[in-house]
Amino acid sequence: MKTYLAKPNEVPKKWYVIDATGKPLGRLAAKIAVILRGKHKPQFTPNVDTGDYVIVINAEKVVLTGKKLDKDGYRYHTKYPGGLKFIPYRRLLEKHPEKAIEIAVRGMLPKNRLRDRFMRKLKVYRGPNHPHAAQKPEVLEI
């Protein structure tokens, strides 16, 4: 028997809505990364985009446990000497809560050509409203 390899047009894509209210950021990002990759499907193939679309609502209500709001944060480098920048999660969640979720999910996806394709299937919104009602997304409890 041959090994099954999924083709991108054979795998049906579904849309899911996840409410981030009161959910820890890391656990939420891990579940989203699994759905975006398609690892929850029996047709999963590592080199093919078999994942589904994910809509995250109420991004501003995501929580971080312990002292991570002030202690941890988002680091990036400007490529100039002494250009290491640090933004604490407290400031990031106040100004751009969507970006905090996107950064966490991006770090949990594989570092290859498919990562940008997976990230295009992630839609994060502040508040309970989203413009994707026409896709008839299913509510997913985490």
Swiss-Prot record:
General function of this protein: This protein is one of the early assembly proteins of the 50S ribosomal subunit, although it is not seen to bind rRNA by itself. It is important during the early stages of 50S assembly.
Q: Which GO MF terms are attached to this record?
A: mRNA binding; structural constituent of ribosome
* The name this protein goes by in its record: Large ribosomal subunit protein uL13
Q: Which organism is it from?
A: Caldicellulosiruptor bescii (strain ATCC BAA-1888 / DSM 6725 / KCTC 15123 / Z-1320)
Q: Which Pfam families does the protein's record reference?
A: Ribosomal_L13 (PF00572)
Keyword check for Ribonucleoprotein: yes
* Superkingdom, natural source: Bacteria
Assembly, per entry: Part of the 50S ribosomal subunit.
Q: Which SUPFAM superfamilies match?
A: Ribosomal protein L13
Give the similarity note: Belongs to the universal ribosomal protein uL13 family.
Could you provide one GO biological process annotation from this protein's UniProt record? translation
Q: Which InterPro entries match?
A: Ribosomal_uL13, Ribosomal_uL13_bac-type, Ribosomal_uL13_sf
GO CC aspect terms: cytosolic large ribosomal subunit
Name the UniProt key words of this record, in alphabetical order: Ribonucleoprotein, Ribosomal protein
